[in-house]
Each structure stands twice: as structure tokens, then as C-alpha cells.
Regions:
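Asparagine-centered strand-capping/turn motif at beta-strand->loop junctions
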Residues: 53-57
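Short, solvent-exposed loop/turn segments enriched in Ser/Thr/Gly
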Residues: 43-50, 97-105
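Beta-strand-rich extracellular modules
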Residues: 95, 109-113
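Surface-exposed binding patches on compact interaction domains or structured appendages
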Residues: 58-86
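Beta-strand-rich interaction surfaces with strong enrichment in secreted/lumenal proteins
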Residues: 39, 77-82, 93-94
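Bacterial Sec-dependent N-terminal signal peptides
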Residues: 1-25
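Short strand-edge motifs at loop-to-beta-strand transitions and within beta-strands
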Residues: 36, 86-92
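Long, low-complexity ectodomains and other extracytoplasmic segments of secretory-pathway proteins
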Residues: 21-45, 52, 113-133
């Protein structure tokens, strides 16, 4: 009986090691910053920032989608595959229309198997336009 347990344990360990090897990550996206603080933005104006990233892995990856859950943000990003050692960017334009503080999340989806998605955040406050008070 102990012999059978030993065989089963060996099979389980080999299975675990082979599964672990299959999910090895060869591409890896690294962002310089994942949060951008705008500070104070005047109501009715646009604020822009850029999130830069680099491929620190061994194989190319691509950004498959970038989503936000707010109509106040316009997004542009590197569409071509990013080779190892190369960099890319995601440009963000925020339309400041409602006075008050804001914190908006941007979800980045890539072919990097090590990441489900990456969250980027923009923060700040929208000040009331002078003369509108």
C-alpha cells in the first residue's frame, strides 16, 4: 500500500511541475508608473498624461484592449507588438466637466500571460471655472 501511495505522490508532483512549466511567462509588461496625479484641473478643460511601459520579457507582447468605465476619458495606445527591451505608451485625455475630486481606473489587457489585466489610475480635482460660481 505504501508503494502505491509513493507512486501516486510522484505522479502528482510530476503533474504539478509540468503544469507550472506550461504557464512560464516569457513576456512581461512593466509600467514606469501606474498612478498619475493631475492636481487641480479647471472645469471645462482637458488634462493629458502618458503611461509609459517596457517589455522586460523574452518574447513580444501586445496590448489587446484598454478600457475605462467613464465617458470623460479618451485613450490611445501602442497597437503594434512590443519586442523585448522596447517600450510603448498609453496616452490619456481627461475631460474635466464635473467639479470635485476624481479617481478613474483604466484597465489594460495584454497578451502577457502573467497578467489578467493591469490597472492604471488617474486622480485629481476639478475646480469650478472662474465666474461660474
Amino acid at each position: 500500500m505504501e508503494y502505491v501511495k509513493g507512486i501516486l505522490l510522484a505522479i502528482l508532483m510530476i503533474s504539478f511541475l509540468s503544469i507550472n512549466a506550461q504557464v512560464r511567462v516569457d513576456s512581461h509588461i512593466v509600467f514606469k508608473d501606474t498612478v498619475y496625479q493631475f492636481g487641480s484641473v479647471e472645469e471645462g478643460s482637458d488634462a493629458e498624461c502618458v503611461f509609459s511601459f517596457i517589455n522586460k520579457g523574452k518574447t513580444p507582447f501586445a496590448i489587446t484592449n484598454v478600457k475605462t468605465f467613464c465617458g470623460c476619458i479618451d485613450l490611445r495606445w501602442t497597437k503594434e507588438p512590443v519586442k523585448p527591451g522596447q517600450s510603448g505608451k498609453i496616452s490619456v485625455k481627461f475631460y474635466a466637466s464635473n467639479p470635485g475630486t476624481f479617481s478613474k481606473t483604466i484597465k489594460v489587457f495584454t497578451t502577457d500571460r502573467g497578467e489578467q489585466s493591469i490597472d492604471l489610475t488617474i486622480k485629481g480635482s476639478v475646480s469650478i471655472k472662474p465666474g461660474k460660481e
